[in-house]
Amino acid sequence: MLKDIFSKKKKKYASVPAESAKQDVPEGIMTKCPDCKKIMLTKELDKNLRVCMNCGYHLQMNAKQRIKSLLDDGSFEEFNQDMMSENPLEFPGYLEKLQKDREKTSLNEAVVTGKGTIDGSPAVVAVMDSSFRMGSMGSVVGEKITLAIEKAREEKVPFIIFTASGGARMQEGLLSLMQMAKTSSALKLFSEEQGLIISVMTHPTTGGVSASFASLGDYNLAEPGALIGFAGRRIIEQTIREELPEDFQTAEFLLKHGQLDSVVHRADMKKTLGSILKMHQTGGDLEWLEN
């Protein structure tokens, strides 16, 4: 009897493998906000222009999403979409990485260029996509942007650039750095002919892109919270041996120090751009605002 009391009884339960305990949730159906960590349905986030419904954080948009949110329906005509990078320096693994990004993004390069209308006003646009090689600027990216500027110059319409880039593409070395001068020179020629340049810096805009065409707009705008700068925060702090402000290199910091004209919420971007374009079409006449 005592033996029965102190003997261990086998528990009656079924063991469930860890893998079967997981819920089968399709990849991409949910998105976590990088700021407040709230988990949202991706389709609802996309409907809200990829702005967090809880904290207002602006998540990254790809080029196609941005074009759809800004240009009038059916007005966008893409050009130079078949241009693709090669491997001039024979950098190991570069071609394989390019192909992987092409398959992932359905793009041939890190920038989409074309022409269309915003609230009825024509413009040539270039939209960078950070999901392709982190939006880095190589020879083809620089060439596509330069050709877009020349197209705007030829058709005498404004040029709008949306930047999202980690900087120059290291796999192309000096050829990549040359694009800084080429794009800047093209903008200079366009500006000398009274061409309107609008630069919209989105997260992130860094390195050689921030140090060239991204900062050369007649209007320099940015999205809230965008990281904008040349060198990284840690490198700067180690160089100057000082601690930088918490909001250093954010869009709001740059606006406060006179390096931006405005920080524009994504929901207001189309209206803001449309207003700027219409103002320049009317020679500064603001009567259209009353209509």
From Swiss-Prot:
Lineage of the source organism?
Bacteria, Bacillati, Bacillota, Bacilli, Bacillales
Q: Which PROSITE patterns match?
A: COA_CT_NTER
Annotated Gene Ontology MF terms?
A: acetyl-CoA carboxylase activity; ATP binding; carboxyl- or carbamoyltransferase activity; zinc ion binding
For this protein, what is the EC number? Answer: 2.1.3.15
Instruction: Tell me the superkingdom of the source.
Output: Bacteria
**Keywords of this entry:** ATP-binding, Cytoplasm, Fatty acid biosynthesis, Fatty acid metabolism, Lipid biosynthesis, Lipid metabolism, Metal-binding, Nucleotide-binding, Transferase, Zinc, Zinc-finger
Question: Which cellular component terms (GO) are annotated to the entry?
Answer: acetyl-CoA carboxylase complex
Which residues are in the CoA carboxyltransferase N-terminal domain?
A: 29-291
Q: How is the cofactor bound?
A: Binds 1 zinc ion per subunit.
Q: Which reaction does it catalyse?
A: N(6)-carboxybiotinyl-L-lysyl-[protein] + acetyl-CoA = N(6)-biotinyl-L-lysyl-[protein] + malonyl-CoA
Q: Which family does it belong to?
A: Belongs to the AccD/PCCB family.
Instruction: Provide the species name.
Output: Bacillus licheniformis (strain ATCC 14580 / DSM 13 / JCM 2505 / CCUG 7422 / NBRC 12200 / NCIMB 9375 / NCTC 10341 / NRRL NRS-1264 / Gibson 46)
Q: What is this protein called?
A: Acetyl-coenzyme A carboxylase carboxyl transferase subunit beta
Protein role: Component of the acetyl coenzyme A carboxylase (ACC) complex. Biotin carboxylase (BC) catalyzes the carboxylation of biotin on its carrier protein (BCCP) and then the CO(2) group is transferred by the transcarboxylase to acetyl-CoA to form malonyl-CoA.
Residues binding Zn(2+), per UniProt: 33, 36, 52, 55
Q: Where is the signal peptide?
A: none
Residues in C4-type zinc fingers run 33-55
Q: Which GO terms describe its biological process?
A: fatty acid biosynthetic process; malonyl-CoA biosynthetic process
- Would the keyword Zinc be found if you checked this record's keyword annotation? yes
Question: Which cofactors are named for this entry?
Answer: Zn(2+)
Annotated pathway: Lipid metabolism; malonyl-CoA biosynthesis; malonyl-CoA from acetyl-CoA: step 1/1
Q: Does this entry carry the keyword Hydrolase? A: no
Gene assigned in the entry: accD
Assembly: Acetyl-CoA carboxylase is a heterohexamer composed of biotin carboxyl carrier protein (AccB), biotin carboxylase (AccC) and two subunits each of ACCase subunit alpha (AccA) and ACCase subunit beta (AccD).
State its location(s). Cytoplasm
